[in-house]
Amino acid sequence: MGLFMKSYMKFSPISLAIFSAFSTQVLAEEMNSETLAPIVVTAAGTSQDLKDAPASISIVNQEQLKQHPANRLEEALQDIPGVNVSGSNVNKSDISIRGLPADYTLIMVDGRRQNTRESRPNGNGGFEGAFIPPLNAIERIEVVRGPMSSLYGSDAMGGVVNIITKNVTKAWTGSASVGFTAHDKSTFGNGHHGNFFVSGPLVQDKLDLQVYGGADYRPEDDIIGGSNRNKNRNINAKLSFTPTDKQTFILEGGRHLLEKYETPGKSLALTTTRGTSVAQNQPSSTRASRNHWSLTHQADWDVMSSELSLYQEKAKREVTTNGVMDSRKPEITNTVFDAKFMLPVANHFFVFGGQYQNAKLEDDSVIKVNRVTRTVNGRTQTRSVPIYQNTENKVHQYAFFVEDEINFSDKFLLTLGTRLDHHQKFGTHWNPRAYAVYHINDNFSVKGGIAKAFRAPSIRELSESYVTATEAGAGVIYGNPNLKPETSVNEEVSVVYHHDSGANATVTLFNTDFKNKLTSHYTGNPDPLTGAKLYEYSNVGRANIKGVEVSSHIPFNEHWNVDLSYTYQHSKRKSDEDISASGVSLRGLPLDNTPKHSASGKLNWIVNDSLSAYTRVAYKGKQIWANPRNGDNRNTYRTRGGYTTVDFGTTYKFNPNVSLNFAVLNIGNEIGERVDTNGGSWTVEDGRRFWTNLNITF
């Protein structure tokens, strides 16, 4: 670990960031007001003080969420160090943590995992981040940066995002908000949104009800690479039954529906070029739905506590092209049973339990590819049309886990844990971790640990019976039952400063060695069944990711404070088998969508009890995007230059129940480079826009 730390200190910008972060102590000593220690639940599977959490964890509270549009997860987490927005364009945006793609981040709502990506083959971004509760229902969002496979298993390789919703209330209460976004340029679509939250007792102290929902709409941009037309709606209901003071049953159900529309000549280019072939694009829409239900039992048995949950999500994707609905309608059904127990014994606190998962995928598989020739505007075009046949596949897995938080003293805590996952296809996998927290004094702490993580291949990737079309039907990808789980070994160490005034700073160094990375590559041969270009999945990828994350909150006085965030990330591909569209090895290049430098700073001004304002500056560095089916044969990869945006916002409270938000976002009208599908930028930023939002509580 010593050599690991020394390798970072040679970077002078990082040394400066560390020095700046801990200068908060000088200002904090002048502040006398005390703040309550934040409580988190994700790092250890149970409630604990943030300063004792065995992980690098950040919190976004509701007050922070309300200061800017946050209809998507990417918007809500924009200032968290180590978190970056990824995706092939703005319509397929997603989040990545510490350089790993979105598939490696586990998204949970109230501790229940959700993952509907299998319902969206050929690109699953742009949807998962929209399947979140409306803002008025969210209490806070906890973000764990780094692997949590020892507690949560597969998908938690990069980190965990846990959205904590508000508890049911013992008295009737509620809130509602409506908002509007107006762009400075007519090429961008103006959007509006609204959501509500209602909670209260049906039978006092026994039966409580909570209902919340929301909707947002944005018309299509008139710029290539801009936003599609979006319609997003959701509704959720929760019943809480408390037969005794120590037992609670919670029944919950909801539905989420997201529709996207793209038109050639607007957000979609008129044509798509692949090699020497030029195809006319068609108007299309995508309808993605997610239905879910859960039943949870929480109990305090005096000597221990428990939580049992049975939940299911069902997601489907439907595509309509040029007015004709595609017969292919992929549907994934995930059913999960969770059991978790918390047991204190002397200076030990045990969290242990198990999990059973069953996934059923219904989708069409390619059985052949027809070549269709037609004449458009006097020009002959030939395109591939895949022919599908419906297939069903199921995969189940079970797991057992245990973690022991050992409290050696008020100063030193050590967490040891492991999880055994048994997958139907690839057998048993162990994921241990060790994490230590040492409080040097009342203000300074050092924490760090080492963990092993894994990600199981998806059903399509594992199953020989699924053949997925790619390159608009010009290629096919076969599943491979011999795939291994992707694995990583992760190390991190943090120095943390916190003060009773609310001042805090954290500097984290991390290192990830990643192997068995799953990639699909062109074999150089045609598929004997369909005649299309043959791709296959294999475990060939290796990579290393290391970096520094800095965050700080500095209160100058009761009226002024500042939030700072900086991330340095150095990722490197280490496999010759990872190749570009032109057949050139990508070894030595950074991972996709991972800027080396990113930073944000927000100056907050609390004028009085009614009025507050902020100014935010954010920078994102240069990024690359490279894979076997991106760009053309002339380019090894595509690049997107760095850029800076500036926002200004204000909140005015008319009274304790009514408030108004107003913000000017991207004041400098930075929209990024022109989209260039042949080797340059792949998306545009929203330009200058004006946002207003009215909040009412009752």
Question: Model segments located where?
Answer:
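N-terminal periplasmic accessory domains that precede
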Residues: L73-A76, S93-S96, M108-D110, E128-F131, ...
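Extracytoplasmic beta-strand/coil segments of soluble accessory domains associated
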Residues: E74-T116, E139
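Short acidic/polar hinge/loop motifs at secondary-structure boundaries
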Residues: S96, R113-R145
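Periplasmic-side early beta-strands and strand-to-turn transitions of outer-membrane beta-barrels
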Residues: T169-A288, N516
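Structural signature of Gram-negative outer-membrane beta-barrels, strongest in the C-terminal barrel
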Residues: T244, E252-G253, Q355, R383-S384, ...
